[in-house]
Amino acid sequence: MAVITGASSGIGLECVLMLLNQGYKVYALSRHATLCVALNHALCECVDIDVSDSNALKEVFLNISAKEDHCDVLINSAGYGVFGSVEDTPIEEVKKQFSVNFFALCEVVQLCLPLLKNKPYSKIFNLSSIAGRVSMLFLGHYSASKHALEAYSDALRLELKPFNVQVCLIEPGPVKSNWEKTAFENDERKDSVYALEVNAAKSFYSGVYQKALNAKEVAQKIVFLSMSHKIKARYLIGLKTQLLLALYQILPSSWYDSLFRLVVLGRKRDA
């Protein structure tokens, strides 16, 4: 049995479909799960839920626990991005970003762990990002939420080792999905000192997403790992992603910062 959040689109949806094809019973959690025609399957139970709603989450897992005695795989795929400068992004948007990307995930894990502990070598896959290793220009709050997820997952892995529950971080680069549409829907204030650079960065990132990874590629990796006996702590997906991390680790911070700004903005900031 598998539990998947963010199940009605992108990587989450692809994981659901692939695990159903492998004969898994899947609990597909998403805000619009029951509206997703692709999830109409005898082995799939769709649950419409905002994962940041704590009371609703508790009720969902009470219902799951009443029907199931174990969970083989938990895939935390729910999440979104907030784009804009650190200074100008409203703090309520920042709180919402962390509520969905981090705190909701923590609660899903807590609620699912009793079921996961009942199955030896069960697995938790937390969908992080290259932004969890390298902070992105004007994606500071999104990057921060993924950095938090990385630290949390490392601690969780250490704690769950005696119970044979494996914890794995999936760190893809840009993936074709609705993510960029949501992230880029808000414009920086026109009077912001960052407006020109934010717009330049948005154009760059939009171009990157035209050549992004396919969600199916990432899902195939996750599903393959879900059926493997032993897995690593993290998987960085995409050659460009691996190159970016290598540059970040090798170059002095000042060099890396200048190079990153030059690539994204096409110029250095005016003095």
Curated annotation (Swiss-Prot):
Gene3D superfamilies on file: NAD(P)-binding Rossmann-like Domain
Q: Which InterPro entries match?
A: NAD(P)-bd_dom_sf (IPR036291), Sc_DH/Rdtase_CS (IPR020904), SDR_fam (IPR002347)
> Which EC class is the enzyme in?
oxidoreductase
Q: What is its EC number?
A: 1.-.-.-
Provide a Gene Ontology MF annotation, just one. oxidoreductase activity
Q: Which domain of life is it from?
A: Bacteria
- Output the CDD domains linked to this UniProt entry: 17beta-HSD-like_SDR_c
Residues annotated as binding NAD(+): 1-25
**Which keywords accompany this UniProt record?**
Oxidoreductase
Instruction: Tell me the active site.
Output: 142 (proton acceptor)
Q: Short name of one Pfam family for this protein?
A: adh_short
Listed binding positions for substrate are: 129
The family note in this entry says:
Belongs to the short-chain dehydrogenases/reductases (SDR) family.
Q: What is this protein called?
A: Probable short-chain type dehydrogenase/reductase VdlC
| Organism of provenance | Helicobacter pylori (strain J99 / ATCC 700824) (Campylobacter pylori J99)
Organism classification:
Bacteria, Pseudomonadati, Campylobacterota, Epsilonproteobacteria, Campylobacterales
